[in-house]
Amino acid sequence: MNFKSNLSVTIILVICSFVQSCSRYSPRLEAALSLAGENRVELEKVLEHYQRDRKKYKAACFLIENMVGRYTLTNQKLDSLDAEFFDAVGNLDIRFEDTEVNVYLVQIKVNEIWNRVLAKYGDPTKYHYGRSDDLRSVTADYLIDNIDEAFATLDYPWTSHLSFEDFCEYVLPYRYGSEPLTEDWRHYFRERYKWIADSLAGNTDPVAVCRLINQDISTWFLPAGGGHIFKNHPRSLSVDQLRKCRLSSCVEQAAVALFAMRSMGLAVAHCTIPHWGNRSAGHDFNAILTKDNEWADFSAAKFNPGENEIANKPPKVFVKKFSRKMMTEDELEVIKQFDFPYAGYQDVTSHLVKTSDVTVQIPDSLKDDVSVVYLCVFNNKRWVPVSYSYSRNGRARFVEMGRRIVYLPQYYKDGRFRPVGDPIFLEKDGSQHPAVADSANPVSRMVLTRKYGRFKYQLGYAGEMVGARFQGADNPEFENAVTLFTIDSLPDSKMDTFAIAPVKCRYVRYLYPDIFARGNAGNVAEIAFIGDDGKPLEGKYIGIKEANANNIRTVFDGNTRNYLRVYQSADSTAVFPGNVIVVDSPKPIWIGLDLGGDRNVTGVAYCPRNDSNNIYPHCTYELFCWDGGWKSLGQRAGQKDSLVYENVPSGCLYILRNRTEGKEERLFTYEDGKQVWW
């Protein structure tokens, strides 16, 4: 939804709420109806239809009042593109029993279809769009059907705990975003899940129903694979499009759960983390209102309530509500600075993660300028607001902020944000302290090895090499092979070399650990066998029969930025790229070299799949420290796999930028001779 247009209609509501009306409707309802134009007749049909049913009448009022600012983008070319794309994707044979392999296969096929329709219709992000406002287009029949179907779910025993307000917010809504409206989605899913009503007759636990539906969703919907495409799609996906596509980013996962579960009377919310506190971007997922009126988060087709993992550090977690807060004009002016629709969100951070309050002391020199303070997090490029507070007695208090995050308090003046004070570390235990640059006690020598932290998925790639063995033999079958080296600890993200006692052999190989038992893809970026001269040995590529020279070359090419994967797939028609070895059943996996004759092996080297955020010799880097703003500490050329800076101010935040290439960069501190990421 376009936030600015949403804001403008909210202002209209604010104004109208103070206008006395001689209408038979409430001021807010009249304000909405007055925006409906000729479609007012359709909306009033709904109100007249429910004149004798007080609850359904109130539900109709709730929907109409909160239609303001809700719409679908319109463009005939996009309709044609969507029809061709989703019909083609809907015809794909997608298997759901092995998610990782199938996501990979589906992505290849879907990307081909997407690129084909883009070539035909052009880039949809560059189309000119019209707008179909719900108030001016939704029919009486559509709303009446939606309301009646939603109320029918109140016969289920697991809805007995719901208040009318929660029912309206989390069961009744007919849409979740800007998607084209779909007829009969509630009926479709109620028919699909009518067996649940029989099997759980008398069960009052909504979480039990949620688990069953979520399990079913996992049989026809992949919880990944669509992010690259959908982030370039200008409007939300309809129910029909989601059912055809069957792959997703986290937003589409949340949408599928809303449609499927609300159709069965479950109070399910769309949760959002607009910005992570320790990396770029954000995240979307779901939560269900339990019979104890607590939120239990989950991820559609992936994690049930009680199993979901919030993998990064959220400063704020919000529930998207269908209703919107009534706000004063001053409040509306304040929230203009957020890049998400703050007025439609409810803060649930403390329900899902540990939080602490943060108090900001406003310097005397700024007290006359600062009436509102924004608490900001770093999104890898700039500081973005995630919360705000009014100044009272020279202080601003922020409640229930996520921990283990660096926050920068700022105020807005003359079109830009300005710092109120130093960044604030909110530690894991809730303790707080400022980040203050100390030039009087500098870090005498700072050694930097990365510009971005290693996240869980990166550590996962590294873990896939643990247990691997480097072996040598005098025969190509590796009978009586000698193990030269075993990886027994988590590898770093760069190329590491280890000396061994010299061993003479002709054939050498990298023997994977049992990746199939672990359920991973055995990602490897680079390996090497070191000779007497300290350089990697060369030879003819050898390996299991499923490997070929193109596969094997990937890990012997001296480039740590590409990588080799191993997949198990029985799909003999699948076409995999050259950096993938495909086997049809679990077996020992190995790749190696025929050295052409006996050679001394004096060491091994290896690097796991990584994100290319290491230090590289061909790149130029610039280090900055925060001291009232980012201050450059000079540029350096990469020296093998590290950079060295001397006499650097201590106690503050740093950021390292690659001036040659790349885009990811992250805040860090320097503690006990190491980079600590925030």
Sequence positions of predicted segments:
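Short beta-strand-plus-loop segments that form exposed binding edges in beta-rich domains
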Residues: 511-518, 657-663
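Short Pro-Gly-centered beta-turn/loop motif in secreted/extracellular proteins
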Residues: 395-415, 502, 647-650
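Hydrophobic/aromatic-rich core segments of domains that either
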Residues: 28-37, 49-52, 198-216, 229-240, ...
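Disordered, acidic Ser/Thr/Pro-rich linker "stalks" and the adjacent N-terminal cap
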Residues: 438-494, 500-503, 518-603, 607-616, ...
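Extracellular beta-sheet/turn segments enriched in Thr/Pro/Gly and aliphatic residues
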Residues: 339-351, 422-450, 674-678
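Bacterial Sec-dependent N-terminal signal peptides
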Residues: 1-28
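Secondary-structure boundary elements
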Residues: 34, 44-45, 53, 57-245
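A short, amphipathic beta-strand motif
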Residues: 356-364
